[in-house]
Amino acid sequence: MSKSSKVGMTDVSVPKSAVLKKRNQREVEAEVDESSEEEFEMDGLLDAEASEDDEEDEENSEDDEEEDSDKELNELLGEEEDPSDYDSENFSDEPQESDTRSITDAISGVKIRSLSDISSQDKQEFHTKYSDGSERIIKPEIEPVYDSDDSDAENFNTIGDIPLSAYDEMPHLGYDINGKRIMRPAKGSALDQLLESIDLPQGWTGLLDQNTGSSLNLTDEELELIRKIQQQENTDANIDPYEATIEWFTSKVEVMPLTAVPEPKRRFVPSKHEAKRVMKIVRAIREGRIIPPSKVKEQIEEERLNYDLWNDDDIAVEDHIMNLRAPKLPPPTNEESYNPPEEYLLTEEEKKQWESLDPADRERNFLPQKFGALRKVPGYQESVRERFERCLDLYLAPRVRHNKLNIDPESLIPELPSPKDLRPFPIRCSTVYQGHTDKIRTISIDPQGLWLATGSDDGSVRIWEILTGRQVFNVQLINKEINDEDHIESLEWNPDSQTGILAVCAGENIYLVVPPIFGFDIENMGRLRIESGWGYDTFGNKTKEEKFKNDEGNEDEDDEDDSATSTAVKKDVARWFPPNQEQTKLGISAIIQCRKTVKKVSWHRKGDYFVTVSPDSKNTAVLIHQLSKHLSQSPFKKSKGIIMDAKFHPFKPQLFVASQRQVRIYDLAQQVLVKKLMPGVRLLSTIDIHPRGDNLLASSYDKRVLWHDLDLSATPYKTLRYHEKAVRSIKFHKGNLPLFASASDDGNIHIFHGTVYDDLMTNPLLVPLKKLTGHKIVNSIGILDLIWHPKEAWLFSAGADGTARLWTT
């Protein structure tokens, strides 16, 4: 320790004259204290010195070092002291005698006593005795001092939080409390440093001591302490882990008890709480809620011997979200009584009608009967079958829990306008067209709205005047005596009113007919349109017929050869024939022969192209025919599914193709698939497109009508389920009236109002208007086809009863 730290009383900045005065005062006080034998206490800051001479030499050397270090520090910092800062009174030119004396000389006669001596006297043990005569040791009170805590110990190096790396390029490590430099210890040669890094000394930590700058190593005591902590041993050597056990409480027999509290009365009185519990069990036994095991066995044996036939055998099932109770059978009605009222008994006609129906279509599976007495009722023959069906329903039919919703039924009904405000629409039958001997499959009306064409299973095509119902033209295209398998599947007028061409699909042939009912100009224009294409048909190929005959033997094979030319594909799918003389007299101008039966035909809006559908023709199911060039081509190399219907877009070069479960929209100009609609039905029957081209109607054989908005998703916008049987036909009004109608095998026609708004944010408005009935159901077939008048709100229908009807306002 330095001189300043040992003394602890003088400041570096105090003048020397003041120090000398204090020294003289202390010498006087020391002599007075020595005479009175009073002791001067110092806090153990001065250590014992060997001799006064050695102390003076050491003091002189330290003064020299202090002067040298102060001089060097002033030179580095460039500090200059102003002489005016010092007081002139504290300085004198004459030397003083007391300057040569050291502080140790001044306090040499003082007797120093450390705190350890005081504590050893204060902290003494007193020995007394207990009341029983045993020895009692009273130890001194523990004072909470910081003997072992070094958290507030001051560091020798006073650089604070500055890292030692800041002094790497300097010869010193920092400064002590007096501002002196702490010089860096001398380092050995490079070889010594290498050897030290290879042979690490014991206790090496790799750290540097902040106070000295040398390596910080652990002592043997610290290493031993670390070893004990790692091995979970006691770090204090004074603790004996195997000290002998002293029975402090059981070694001596106690004469008096620890507590002499007398026992309470409740220890000797029966418990009231236990009495309540016992009485609760006794009441349960008396009431039968608790049964002894012996009686339980007796009851089980008695129940086994005395079986109750009419007892409820339902096993109690805990209420759980996964436990769904089986629905109970409905109670018997008056019809099932052995003596029902007369109004429940069936007549002979009703019995025959009930017996003629299929068992699945019957409303009830029994006939009501009347007996005079209960003893006359015979055994029920259907009991075994009903029990068997009940068992099948219990373990095969899925169970669903329907949560009841507290919703006002009137709030679910949309607010629709009144049908009276949406007139005109057809409400009654005004004309019936009779003449066909078999069911009428298809009807069509000419663009002018004057002539109605009908095609029937009797093989004839008839044209009627719509206002009077008079038949003006009749042509027999199929001889039923020779060919009774083919039918008139479809027919449609050419949209061009100046041609008067009627396309009729009969079996595998397509007949282009110009009926002689329009006048010379229109009939001549129609024939010229058809005959102008014969020059384009051959392409100069004389062996056309031979190629077609060779291909007829392979018509069941798939024509998927990608190397075939476009002309060969067009010529292979269909063949155009001119009519013979007899067919010309009937008004037939051209015949197109396909490979399979043609089911549907639809014209393009310009009247030059028409598309046909042959569901059994595989990849050539859809054919596009050109009237002006007598060309037939298949737009698809493969048909995905069985094709049911196909139609052109009203004004875009797009083709709508309906299979059994999907509707695909193709762009004919770019030859790509535009969109695929998913109606979500099992079997589509027909489709129709709104005149604006942004909505589509589809009907299905599973009693559904689907409205698709092409601007929305691929799923239906609305699904209408109001028909009881398969829906055969559905049609939009092609004029300016927002109407559409659907026909079904239930013999009903439903008229709807369907407004499509120009605003894309507004959904179409669908309002049911009228239900028309009049056609008879023959062999479970009702109405087969519908067509709207091109200008008026009139509807034409074709039924299986062999009649066509006009429904007007």
Swiss-Prot record:
InterPro entries noted in UniProt: BOP1/Erb1, BOP1_N_dom, WD40/YVTN_repeat-like_dom_sf, WD40_repeat_CS, WD40_repeat_dom_sf, WD40_rpt
Keyword tags: Nucleus, Repeat, Ribosome biogenesis, rRNA processing, WD repeat
Ranges of the WD repeats in the UniProt entry: 435-474, 483-523, 593-635, 638-676, 679-718, 722-762, 778-809
GO BP annotation list: maturation of 5.8S rRNA from tricistronic rRNA transcript (SSU-rRNA, 5.8S rRNA, LSU-rRNA); maturation of LSU-rRNA from tricistronic rRNA transcript (SSU-rRNA, 5.8S rRNA, LSU-rRNA)
Stretches for region Required for interaction with YTM1: 383-419
Localization in the cell: Nucleus, Nucleolus; Nucleus, Nucleoplasm
Region of interest called Disordered, as start-end residue ranges on this chain: 1-107, 545-569
GO (cellular component) term, any one: preribosome, large subunit precursor
GO molecular function, a single term: ribonucleoprotein complex binding
Acidic residues bias locations: 30-70, 77-97, 553-563
One Pfam assignment: WD40
Chain residue ranges for the region called Required for interaction with NOP7: 267-383
Subunit structure as annotated in this protein's UniProt entry: Component of the NOP7 complex, composed of ERB1, NOP7 and YTM1. The complex is held together by ERB1, which interacts with NOP7 via its N-terminal domain and with YTM1 via a high-affinity interaction between the seven-bladed beta-propeller domains of the 2 proteins. The NOP7 complex associates with the 66S pre-ribosome.
Alphabetized PANTHER family for the sequence: RIBOSOME BIOGENESIS PROTEIN BOP1 (PTHR17605:SF0), RIBOSOME BIOGENESIS PROTEIN BOP1 BLOCK OF PROLIFERATION 1 PROTEIN (PTHR17605)
Function as written in the Swiss-Prot or TrEMBL entry: Component of the NOP7 complex, which is required for maturation of the 25S and 5.8S ribosomal RNAs and formation of the 60S ribosome.
Family according to the record: Belongs to the WD repeat BOP1/ERB1 family.
HAMAP family documented for this protein: BOP1
Protein name per the record: Ribosome biogenesis protein ERB1
Name of the gene encoding the protein in the UniProt record: ERB1
